[in-house]
């Protein structure tokens, strides 16, 4: 993702990314994943695999104390390139703001969801929550995703028509597939140009509202509402721009946001939430600020999770007291493990794979062997892991059941003001929702 962002700014920035990959190759090769870690009173087994470029890049730039001459040199070079990157980003934005490069418009209400940092902030579950809410207001809504890591190539790809899935996770990409899985009645489209996929959604699905998933930097398209997500656990990364840090653009650019949505506020460190409020207000006096949390909703059998849109499972509370093996390949496994602990699950052990790891049949055989050895009642994985499990494994008869934990976003502080504003703006542009009762309850 980091390289993809830099690649959008052609020339010097693209060349810089190639140089950085070469420089980090030796560094990555020498690093090994930590073998054993412990959280609370649970044993944690970390697999002995080499993590990918993005994992080590994040580890490197977030080190608070840069040790050694070589690492200091790398950081100095990164900082130099980050200054170049900042100028390119500012130039590109200026060209759009002054009209030197024309923005395209869609004949519908456009909402952009995104962030100013590389990495996850909860865009996918937030897009799901927002799409459901708008649909319940009576508007036809579609989600436009760029198709990150998708094998599909073309102008417009239909992941879901709102009734059935049209692509698998490998073809559509993880994010788009997960969106489609949870959104009956909401088409999900992928394609590099949101104006193209947006027009298709309007013409073929009658879309009245288009949600741009990860669209904060997609300046090519006009939008009616810009929603900026900020992870309350990892606030603005380390404060530096790419490649010295994880900022996609300067913090001053949060002045574009109409809404600041803080995610995972229940897991935030002391002082993090006031800091986000203060930082946002220093650049943006008028935007709404909302706080949200991620809540576990249900556990779905892996085979059922793959079946079709909106697969059902058991309530999250029913897993309380059960002995489970947690398995994950995500950036923050401790958060996933803490969620299980908070639910009252007896997590006997947790197997951590590198972030974005693609599970092979050998990996899953190791997981099953470990589960049987420990005598657990279930294996629990995240939805991001579920899309990486091979199809043969999904269809196989497992002696220990595999469950996928499904998480949803819940808006808290600022919720009423946000939905009141959203309803007013939708009604002003589109009129009242026509397809369902106007006073539908918004969760």
Which sequence ranges carry the predicted segments?
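C-terminal accessory "lid"/substrate-recognition subdomains
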Residues: 16, 21, 48-68, 235-375, ...
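A transmembrane-helix-recognition feature enriched in membrane-embedded lipid enzymes
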Residues: 49-108
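Residue-level signal for inorganic ion chemistry
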Residues: 84, 124, 179, 213, ...
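Walker A (P-loop) phosphate-binding motif
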Residues: 94, 98-149, 160-161
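Conserved beta-strand elements of the Class I
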Residues: 142-144, 228, 324-327
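Phosphate/Mg2+-binding loops and adjacent switch elements
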Residues: 148-284, 291, 298
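Short, flexible loop segments at boundaries between secondary-structure elements
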Residues: 354-357, 399-427
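Acidic beta-strand-to-loop metal/phosphate-binding motif
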Residues: 377-384
């Amino acid at each position: 993702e980091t390289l993809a962002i830099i690649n959008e700014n052609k020339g010097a920035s693209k060349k810089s990314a190639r140089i950085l990959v070469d420089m980090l190759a030796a560094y990555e090769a020498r690093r090994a994943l930590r073998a054993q870690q412990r959280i609370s009173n649970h044993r944690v087994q970390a697999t002995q695999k080499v993590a990918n470029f993005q994992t080590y890049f994040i580890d490197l730039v977030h080190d608070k104390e840069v040790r050694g001459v070589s690492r200091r040199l790398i950081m100095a070079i990164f900082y130099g390139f980050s200054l170049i990157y900042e100028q390119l980003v500012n130039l590109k934005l200026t060209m759009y703001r002054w009209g030197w490069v024309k923005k395209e418009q869609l004949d519908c209400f456009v909402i952009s969801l995104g962030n100013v940092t590389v990495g996850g902030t909860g865009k996918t579950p937030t897009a799901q929550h927002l799409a459901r809410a708008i649909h319940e207001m009576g508007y036809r809504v579609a989600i436009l995703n760029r198709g990150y890591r998708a094998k599909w190539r073309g102008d417009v790809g239909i992941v879901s028509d709102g009734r059935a899935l049209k692509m698998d996770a490998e073809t559509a990409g993880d994010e788009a597939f997960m969106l489609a899985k949870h959104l009956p009645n909401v088409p999900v489209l992928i394609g590099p140009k949101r104006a193209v996929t947006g027009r298709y959604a309007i013409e073929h699905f009658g879309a009245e509202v288009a949600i741009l998933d990860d669209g904060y930097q997609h300046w090519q398209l006009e939008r009616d509402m810009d929603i900026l997500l900020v992870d309350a656990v990892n606030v603005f990364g380390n404060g530096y721009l790419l490649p010295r840090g994880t900022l996609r653009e300067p913090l001053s650019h949060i002045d574009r946001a109409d809404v600041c949505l803080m995610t995972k506020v229940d897991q935030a460190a002391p002082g993090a939430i006031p800091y986000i409020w203060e930082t946002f207000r220093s650049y943006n006096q008028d935007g709404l600020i909302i706080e949200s949390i991620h809540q576990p909703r249900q556990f779905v059998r892996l085979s059922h999770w793959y079946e079709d849109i909106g697969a059902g499972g058991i309530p999250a509370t029913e897993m309380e007291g059960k002995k489970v093996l947690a398995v994950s390949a995500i950036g923050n496994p401790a958060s996933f493990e803490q969620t299980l602990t908070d639910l009252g699950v007896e997590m006997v052990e947790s197997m951590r794979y590198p972030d974005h790891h693609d599970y092979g049949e050998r990996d899953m055989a190791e997981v099953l062997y470990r589960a049987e050895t420990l005598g657990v009642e279930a294996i629990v994985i995240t939805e991001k892991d579920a899309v990486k499990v091979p199809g043969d494994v999904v269809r196989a008869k497992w002696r220990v059941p595999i469950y996928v934990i499904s998480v949803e976003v819940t808006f808290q502080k600022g919720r009423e003001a946000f939905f009141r504003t959203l309803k007013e703006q939708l009604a002003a542009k589109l009129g009242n929702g026509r397809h369902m009762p106007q006073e539908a309850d918004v969760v």
